[in-house]
């Protein structure tokens, strides 16, 4: 549930998972510490914030023998939302968001200049869905956290009553 509803309260998560609030709190903190939960974000509608044009830009270095530092060379370009290393004809695929075709053209020039690459661009026409969280069994994920260390459940009368 947290992967789908990041603002869910520990009380509601505990109710749905059949655990005590203190056990859920400990387990979620452990999942954060272990790197299973890597953060919480607010997803903004790109059109509402003035970035209606999404494109995927495949990049390939001109010099195949050059060091593979393309992600670092492009990190300063905030219009690049994601950078994926891929197998195939290109080395990386970038997901970019900009306000207009003119801004996309400018961004492509910046990418080419900063990284010494050729580009191939695909413009997104519509997005039926994105940012889909994986389907996870809440209890299984929380139990995984409990398996990684001690838990308050043993001493929690609410959980003891459920057994």
Segment roles from a protein language model:
Residues 1-163:
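A compositional/biophysical signature of low hydrophobicity enriched in polar/charged and small residues
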